[in-house]
Amino acid sequence: MVAVYNSQAQNQGLSRDEMYAVIGDLIAADGPQPSDALADECLFGFDIATVGGGLHHFADPELAADRLVERLRPGGVLLVWDFLPHGPMSGHTRDYGVMHHGLSEERVRAMFERAGAAKGFSLEVLGSGMSIDVGGHGEKIRREIFLARGEKAV
């Protein structure tokens, strides 16, 4: 998948500096640092790091936030959208990669503080939520969504 992505970028005339993907694991818990593939200095100093609807799939969302903030420049922004806490759903378990049934504002705030991205922290609930068709069987569930942001300390 990554090779195809990089090939398509190159075919569009984009340089490696403009668009390029690498394979790596930022949240490997078996070591203090991510894989060697992610050690290149060009993979640090970002203006923004985002996770869209994914933190509830990580076994350790706090570690994910830590590792993302490490890659931001001072003043860079961590931006996350995900679900607020909700009850478990029948048949939608860890088999589908759901590790957490939403994240509370308190947990997200503590996560940003721990990661060093608490400056200007805000968490907003977006609209009236999101309706999701689970498993393509017509069973719809509604989830409240939040958008959280914070800046890495200078």
Place the predicted regions along the sequence by residue.
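Class I SAM-dependent methyltransferase SAM/SAH-binding core
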Residues: 1-39
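Short N-terminal helix/helix-N-cap motif within the alpha/beta-hydrolase-1
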Residues: 6, 58-63, 88
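Short catalytic micro-motifs in class I SAM-dependent methyltransferases
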Residues: 53-54
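Conserved acidic residues
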Residues: 47
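C-terminal alpha-helical "lid/dimerization" subdomain adjacent to the S-adenosyl-L-methionine
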Residues: 15-16, 77-148
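A short glycine-rich, Lys/Arg-flanked "PGG" loop and its adjoining helix->strand segment in the class I
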Residues: 62-77
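A conserved beta-strand element that flanks and buttresses the S-adenosyl-L-methionine
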Residues: 50
